[in-house]
A protein has these predicted regions:
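Non-catalytic interface/linker regions that flank or bridge core catalytic/transmembrane domains
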Residues: 1-2, 168
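Divalent metal-dependent catalytic cores for phosphoryl transfer on phosphate-bearing substrates
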Residues: 6-13, 31-159
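Conserved small/polar residues in nucleotide/adenosyl-binding loops
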Residues: 162-169
Length: 173
């Protein structure tokens, strides 16, 4: 297994500066949320750090990794390239980085789409991605406060945010 510093160095080379900073911000947010909500902060930090490991990979590579993963990929995911980096990233983390922790793999896998019955760690990564310091969409401050005061309500609001028919500037990355 790689050390945290080795993984940061790897990501710094692999990702754009903006995406690397975003990954660090998500990791920091996940660490804080995990501590508050009874999850392992170090595990949350690692999942947050790695959540976008394949976000900037070529589309063909993302598709190949996603299909190799043998994960249950929905038709909606297959038809939406912007979602491929979740399952591709989970497979990459397992096959290339040797991380086999199913909690981390699922948190990365579902960080863009969520799912019914998400674990607390999956929810934390989902939320950390939404409220990280680099986010600046309308009402992000409200979501940040809610995430630390009423996590279940924050998850509910997050689901509404992404299923609402009105366009919102929240770019999931």
């Amino acid at each position: 297994m790689y050390s945290l510093e080795e993984l940061k160095s790897f990501l710094k080379k692999r990702l754009s500066k903006k995406r690397f900073i975003h990954s660090l911000n998500v990791a920091d947010e996940a660490y804080k949320l995990a501590g508050m909500y009874g999850e392992d902060p170090d595990k949350a930090y690692l999942a947050g750090l790695l959540h976008d490991v394949c976000k900037e990979s070529p589309t063909a590579e993302q598709e190949e990794l996603m299909l190799k993963s043998n994960m249950n990929i929905s038709g909606a995911e297959l038809s939406t390239k912007a979602l491929w980096h979740g399952p591709a990233g989970a497979y990459f983390i397992k096959s290339e980085l040797g991380i086999n922790d199913s909690d981390i793999l699922n948190a990365v896998r579902y960080h863009t789409i969520g799912r019914s019955g998400m674990s607390k760690l999956e929810e934390i990564i989902y939320m950390a991605d939404l409220i990280s310091d680099d986010r600046d969409y309308k009402d992000v401050d409200k979501m940040r406060k809610l995430a630390y005061s009423d996590f279940e309500r924050a998850m509910y609001e997050a689901c509404l945010l992404y299923t609402s028919p009105s366009p919102r500037d929240t770019e999931r990355s």
